[in-house]
Amino acid sequence: MFKHSTGILSRTVSARSPTLVLRTFTTKAPKIYTFDQVRNLVEHPNDKKLLVDVREPKEVKDYKMPTTINIPVNSAPGALGLPEKEFHKVFQFAKPPHDKELIFLCAKGVRAKTAEELARSYGYENTGIYPGSITEWLAKGGADVKPKK
């Protein structure tokens, strides 16, 4: 199979000749979040949106962004596909419900995009990405941002 910008381009070989079939699909693009939008979510947590840090636990130990949950994409890529009880057993918190918007971040934005794509494959349709991630967050003074009561 060959990946194509508008869908999946697959090749079917028959006795006569190869045939190319273009299958298209549409999905809602993830929302892209800026530093200011994420800062607002940290300062004013929203029960309809959830910040998901997909870095590895050892990275999160160095700096944990306020109000985030940690679901590491490299060591647990299938986490969002787990049954709720198993997810809770592994992560010690409830599996995010499908009706929440999951906003993914990592160190520099690359793993966040991967995690967002995986989340979609597990039925999470309302997703976002903070491409600046922790690198931008810290560079712009995010370490001083705290939830307001």
Swiss-Prot record:
Mutant phenotype after disruption: Increases frequency of mitochondrial genome loss.
Enzyme type, top EC level: transferase
GO molecular function: thiosulfate-cyanide sulfurtransferase activity
Active site: C106
PANTHER family assigned to the protein according to its UniProt record, in alphabetical order: THIOSULFATE SULFURTRANSFERASE RDL2, MITOCHONDRIAL-RELATED (PTHR44086), THIOSULFATE SULFURTRANSFERASE_RHODANESE-LIKE DOMAIN-CONTAINING PROTEIN 3 (PTHR44086:SF10)
Signal peptide span: none
UniProt protein name: Thiosulfate sulfurtransferase RDL2, mitochondrial
InterPro entries reported for this sequence: Rhodanese-like_dom, Rhodanese-like_dom_sf
Major subcellular site: mitochondrion
Organism of provenance: Saccharomyces cerevisiae (strain ATCC 204508 / S288c) (Baker's yeast)
Record-linked Gene3D superfamilies: Rhodanese-like domain
Keyword line: Mitochondrion, Transferase, Transit peptide
Task of the protein: Thiosulfate sulfurtransferase which catalyzes the transfer of sulfane sulfur from thiosulfate to cyanide.
Known EC number: 2.8.1.1
Catalytically driven reaction(s): thiosulfate + hydrogen cyanide = thiocyanate + sulfite + 2 H(+)
